[in-house]
């Protein structure tokens, strides 16, 4: 293997090693130290998982690949969230944390991930345009088949408001959401992709290996990273709760924001790497697909995990969780409305980031409902502007796929739909 690849894998293994020692020995010296050790292991394993999932696309194609890679790539986030949901079946105190991690990761992805990738991509295009003395683009254009992802996300965002209205996530709702996820994978698997896959960073080094070696490395990384994540998910989740009390920070806040940062970091970094290499559409396409994952498979799995842990068939939501769901769903509707025409403008990216930052200053319940209303108002304005794209977007998940490249683009910018 290339020395650069060996060094990166070894570094991740070294970072994860203390957590394995803690887990095997049962050592728990301090809640904050536990959080650092187990959190670092989650980040390291997430990087290995992301590299393997990216490189695996060289050898696996079709709907099966999409299904497998989608499930594997979200393992870090799901492992923590489903642990909380499972524990809530026997301990009601954990019910709040299951929804906290989901809403935090969801808003982080759209409020931080989307704008960051778009602004980086447009900055790169601006520099390229300046060198070539041509007009710089003001928006990132997505391929036409991205409408499938946006269509599914739009339907899921609208359906998400039913959850706070019911005050719970019923198990039948979870089953429906999981079926929607299966339909999304099937529909995504039908999309034509005739171009050459592009790889960056460690994934590119893995892809360059001989076929037999490459497949062995990919399988090895999958197994090793999954084993680490499954081993440390429980102590990491518990350390988030314990560390909050130890340092005087709301445990709910740590679960909502620190856990998603650990699990989403590799995906963000890989998306930014794509944007830095002029593949902005591929980068944002991956993050849009991740939103579909979260609103379907993740939310749908919560009541099932709760029931499996000894709870009832419904995962109850308290007032704070209902507030968080409304804020998250309204943000998703706003994000979908802004990209409905498959053009992501720089001012839209700045607006999403600004509103995301504003929520940390607005902490009271009434203020957060006002912020939700503001997000919905922005969505209404964007829907009016993009009204011609509403019906095509809502119909996209049900239409027969058409092989087509977006104008002025290339197949290499076709967004991935694996995460």
Feature locations, PLM:
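Hydrophobic alpha-helical segments, chiefly the membrane-spanning helices
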Residues: 1-419
């Amino acid at each position: 293997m290339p020395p650069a690849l060996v060094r990166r894998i070894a570094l991740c293994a070294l970072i994860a090693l203390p957590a394995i020692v803690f887990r095997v020995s049962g050592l728990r010296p301090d809640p904050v130290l536990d959080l650092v050790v187990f959190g670092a292991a989650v980040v390291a394993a997430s990087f290995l998982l992301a590299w393997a999932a990216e490189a695996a696309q060289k050898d696996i194609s079709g709907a099966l690949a999409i299904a497998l890679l989608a499930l594997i790539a979200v393992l870090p986030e799901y492992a923590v969230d489903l642990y909380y949901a499972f524990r809530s079946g026997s301990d009601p105190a954990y019910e709040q944390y299951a929804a906290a991690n989901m809403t935090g990761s969801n808003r982080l992805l759209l409020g931080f991930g989307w704008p960051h990738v778009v602004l980086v991509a447009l900055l790169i295009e601006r520099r390229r345009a300046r060198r070539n003395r041509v007009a710089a683009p003001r928006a990132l254009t997505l391929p036409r088949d991205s409408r499938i992802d946006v269509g599914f996300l739009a339907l899921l965002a609208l359906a998400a408001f039913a959850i706070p209205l019911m005050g719970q996530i019923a198990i039948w709702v979870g089953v429906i959401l999981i079926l929607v996820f299966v339909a999304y994978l099937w529909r995504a698997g039908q999309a034509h992709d005739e171009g050459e896959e592009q790889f960056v960073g460690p994934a590119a080094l893995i892809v360059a290996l001989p076929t037999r070696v490459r497949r062995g490395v990919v399988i090895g990384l999958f197994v090793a990273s999954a084993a680490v994540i499954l081993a440390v998910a429980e102590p990491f989740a518990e350390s988030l709760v314990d560390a909050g009390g130890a340092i005087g920070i709301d445990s709910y806040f740590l679960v909502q924001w620190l856990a998603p940062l650990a699990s989403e970091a590799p995906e963000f970094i890989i998306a930014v790497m794509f944007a830095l290499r002029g593949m902005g559409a591929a980068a944002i396409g991956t993050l849009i697909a991740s939103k579909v994952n979260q609103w379907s498979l993740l939310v749908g799995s919560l009541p099932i995990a709760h029931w499996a842990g000894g709870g009832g068939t419904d995962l109850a939501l308290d007032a704070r969780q209902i507030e968080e769901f409304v804020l998250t769903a309204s943000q998703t509707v706003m994000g979908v409305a802004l990209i409905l025409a498959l053009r992501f403008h720089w001012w839209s990216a700045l607006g999403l980031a600004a509103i995301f930052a504003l929520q940390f200053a607005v902490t009271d319940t009434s203020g957060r409902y006002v912020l939700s209303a503001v997000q919905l108002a922005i969505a209404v304005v964007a829907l009016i502007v993009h009204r011609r794209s509403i019906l095509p977007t809502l119909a996209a998940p049900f239409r027969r796929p058409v092989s087509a490249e977006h104008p002025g683009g290339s197949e290499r910018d076709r967004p991935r739909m694996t995460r």
